[in-house]
């Protein structure tokens, strides 16, 4: 049942025109520049405007429509650029030679400093967003279609803006509607994910498939029938996919295999485009739709059948976990920060998984051979995933400070985790120290042996081997699947698993089996180290958000506070907000190593050119396995070898990028200065470590203290 309140809030432009109207203090106007910072910090901090959960919920709900409007405007802009300022049609006719560009540059700049010639008689910057590839996969064959989609995007943006206004000012949902989780799950699963996937599968079958099949066969884009002709004229489809002549009969008579001409289970890549078989992705979206349509009927609403989340959570207790998940239902239905933290953690993890699938199972035509785009998409999804995971910790900490009520949480999992937080943090701290010293130690050993001229004593594939045997086993299991556990598949899910297959498009490697060795084993442990440190900082921020031995009354000071007064030395930068700040810094560290690993590994072992005799020449000549096993190798053969091209680019067609590269490093270094001033954070970490020493009765008589701001200042 949808419960709404009519006309709850007046629409008033006079009110909106007043800066800071949402806060009594800010509405008075500026006295210092702090007013400007607080205006930005609190405009969307709805918790600070009111304590009324219903009103907060409505504001969040309404703001989501605003967010969607911005996304539609942005997307519309992308499509408009494709229509108005791009060489899309030229690229479509020759995707292996023409480089994608949708960003016109003023003649004053000149093409000679921007990638040289992008092809198709076009002046502009080469783009690496993958939009051209996604447009081809969805069946867009002309710039006119891009114009139409761009206009459609603006119409949807207007609709979203209207919905945001309507659902706050005209018909605002009641709190009970926001808290009806079963109904929400049903509708989101069946509606958004189920019907969303189904409609996309429908579009792929009726529009993308026929158009892509003709494009793959070399038919000129201008000769291909328009999308609506494929939808309305069954004879056109029958020429490409004979099963269309039979209509729905095979579906209702359960002879589904009749449809295997457009819904397949092949595995591997299309040798023409280097992308996944579109008939495989059709099958995938259809299957996903079925799963989510079923999932959207699992939760109990008006009819007394199905799951109740409260019951599930309260039944979830093991022999060692006290009250288990009791009380969590109340948390998730009254604290949107807790809900958001959970969702960000899951979506962040998922986004990182997407990053790894984009290169190992490239979903769009000609994506795999566009190396710049592959690198950009991997970097993009890793970063977005990192931001979301850190955001999860941020909102978990805000939940702890603002929404957590210790009196209602007794002996459930959350309470138990908080009560043994010292054990958790000190163990995690130990794990970080162990991982850091050992993984770095392996590299230092190799550098030393290399310097002493003792290659036979190094950890490498040719001396002391540290093979990633579990990873190799997983790879092999998947590589042999097509002839054993997946008898109907023509190839394994990804060429990277192994085997002898190589897909090359236009003389460039799309994908081939990726070998893993000692070098990967070493850098993998650096990944483990950086990820654990990030988790340590973020988790410590959450578990000590309300109190710590250093500041027992942290909950009263709020989520962010500069220092706990002049009388308490070493309490600066110890708020939950500061932990997010430091966690973000380590997230950058972690992702840098991941992107270094990816770039070098792909250039060394995957990307390159293929001769007519099927001989592969990799970009950096397969030097990863022997060079990346020392710190010196990383510095010399990756960082310097790759950066020197940029540093020496001023006289080449890449000079504009060289200048941007220089500027970006200046911005980075300038912001890093401010980051390195953290002090109080360490004192709290020390408290946990002291606790561990006390536990084992090996505590020193002299208490350790972190340096204060003054002591730690570099004079």
From Swiss-Prot:
Chlorophyll a binds at residues 673, 681. Chlorophyll a' binds at residue 665. Pfam families: PsaA_PsaB. Its main location: plastid. It catalyses: reduced [plastocyanin] + hnu + oxidized [2Fe-2S]-[ferredoxin] = oxidized [plastocyanin] + reduced [2Fe-2S]-[ferredoxin]. One of its GO terms (cellular component) is photosystem I. P700 is a chlorophyll a/chlorophyll a' dimer, A0 is one or more chlorophyll a, A1 is one or both phylloquinones and FX is a shared 4Fe-4S iron-sulfur center. It is found in: Plastid, Chloroplast thylakoid membrane. Disulfide bonds: none annotated. Signal peptide: none annotated. GO terms for biological process: photosynthesis. The PsaA/B heterodimer binds the P700 chlorophyll special pair and subsequent electron acceptors. PSI consists of a core antenna complex that captures photons, and an electron transfer chain that converts photonic excitation into a charge separation. The eukaryotic PSI reaction center is composed of at least 11 subunits. This is Photosystem I P700 chlorophyll a apoprotein A1. It comes from Phlegmariurus squarrosus. The lineage of its organism: Eukaryota, Viridiplantae, Streptophyta, Embryophyta, Tracheophyta. The gene is psaA.
């Amino acid at each position: 049942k949808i419960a709404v309140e009519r006309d709850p809030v007046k629409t008033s432009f006079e009110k909106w025109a007043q800066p800071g109207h949402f806060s009594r203090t800010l509405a008075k106007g500026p006295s210092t520049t702090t007013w400007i910072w607080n205006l930005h910090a609190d405009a969307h901090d709805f918790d600070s405007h009111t304590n009324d959960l219903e009103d907060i919920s409505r504001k969040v709900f309404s703001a989501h429509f605003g967010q969607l409007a911005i996304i539609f405007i942005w997307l519309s802009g992308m499509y408009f650029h494709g229509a108005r300022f791009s060489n899309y049609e030229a690229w479509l006719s020759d995707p292996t030679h023409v480089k994608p560009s949708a960003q016109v540059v003023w003649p004053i700049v000149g093409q000679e400093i921007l990638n040289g010639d992008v092809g198709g008689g076009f002046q502009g910057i080469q783009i690496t967003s993958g939009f051209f590839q996604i447009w081809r996969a969805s069946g867009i064959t002309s710039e006119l279609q891009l114009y139409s989609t761009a206009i459609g995007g603006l119409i949807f943006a207007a609709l979203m803006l209207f919905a945001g206004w309507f659902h706050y000012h005209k018909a605002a949902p009641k709190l009970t509607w926001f808290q009806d989780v079963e109904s929400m799950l049903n509708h989101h699963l069946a509606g958004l994910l189920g019907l969303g996937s189904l409609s996309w599968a429908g579009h792929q079958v009726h529009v993308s498939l026929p158009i892509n099949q003709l494009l793959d066969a070399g038919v000129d884009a201008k000769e291909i029938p328009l999308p609506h002709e494929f939808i309305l004229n069954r004879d056109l489809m029958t020429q490409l996919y004979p099963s269309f002549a039979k209509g729905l009969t095979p579906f209702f008579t359960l002879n589904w295999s009749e449809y295997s001409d457009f819904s397949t289970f092949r595995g591997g890549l299309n040798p023409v485009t280097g992308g996944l078989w579109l008939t495989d992705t059709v099958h995938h979206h259809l299957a996903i739709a079925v799963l989510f349509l079923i999932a959207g009927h699992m939760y109990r609403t008006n009819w007394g059948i199905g799951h109740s989340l409260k019951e599930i959570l309260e039944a979830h207790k093991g022999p060692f976990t006290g009250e288990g998940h009791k009380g969590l239902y109340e948390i998730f239905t009254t604290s949107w920060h807790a809900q958001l933290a959970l969702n960000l953690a899951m979506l962040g993890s998922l986004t990182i998984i997407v990053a790894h699938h984009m290169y190992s199972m490239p979903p769009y035509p000609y994506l795999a051979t566009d190396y710049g785009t592959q690198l950009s998409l991997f970097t993009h999804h890793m970063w977005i995933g990192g931001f979301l995971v850190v955001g999860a910790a941020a909102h978990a900490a805000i939940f702890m400070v603002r929404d957590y009520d210790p009196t209602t949480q007794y002996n459930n999992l959350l309470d138990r985790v908080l009560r043994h937080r010292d054990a958790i943090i000190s163990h995690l701290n130990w794990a970080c120290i162990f991982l850091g010293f050992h993984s770095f130690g392996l590299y230092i050993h190799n550098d030393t042996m290399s310097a002493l001229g003792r290659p036979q004593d190094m950890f490498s594939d040719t001396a002391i081997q540290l093979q990633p045997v579990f990873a190799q086993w997983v790879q092999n299991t998947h590589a042999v699947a097509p002839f054993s556990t997946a008898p109907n598949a023509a190839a394994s899910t990804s060429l990277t698993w192994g085997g002898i297959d190589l897909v090359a498009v236009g003389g460039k490697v799309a994908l081939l089996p990726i070998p893993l060795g000692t070098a990967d084993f070493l850098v993998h442990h650096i990944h483990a180290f950086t990820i654990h440190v990030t988790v340590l900082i973020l988790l410590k921020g959450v578990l000590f958000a309300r109190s710590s031995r250093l500041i027992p009354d942290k909950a009263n000071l709020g989520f962010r506070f500069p220092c706990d007064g002049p009388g308490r030395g070493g309490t600066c930068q110890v708020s939950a907000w500061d932990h997010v700040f430091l966690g973000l810094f380590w997230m950058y560290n972690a992702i840098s190593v991941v992107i270094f690993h990816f770039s070098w590994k792909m250039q060394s072992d995957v990307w390159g050119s293929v001769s007519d005799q099927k001989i592969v020449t990799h970009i950096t000549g397969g030097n990863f396995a022997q060079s990346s096993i020392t710190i010196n190798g990383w510095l010399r053969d990756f960082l310097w070898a790759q950066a020197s091209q940029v540093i020496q680019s001023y006289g080449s067609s890449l000079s504009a990028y060289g200048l941007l590269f220089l500027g970006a490093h200046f911005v980075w270094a300038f912001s890093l200065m401010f980051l390195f001033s953290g002090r109080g954070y360490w004192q709290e970490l020390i408290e946990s470590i002291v606790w561990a020493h006390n536990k084992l009765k090996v505590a020193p008589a002299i208490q350790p203290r972190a340096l204060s701001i003054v002591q730690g200042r570099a004079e």
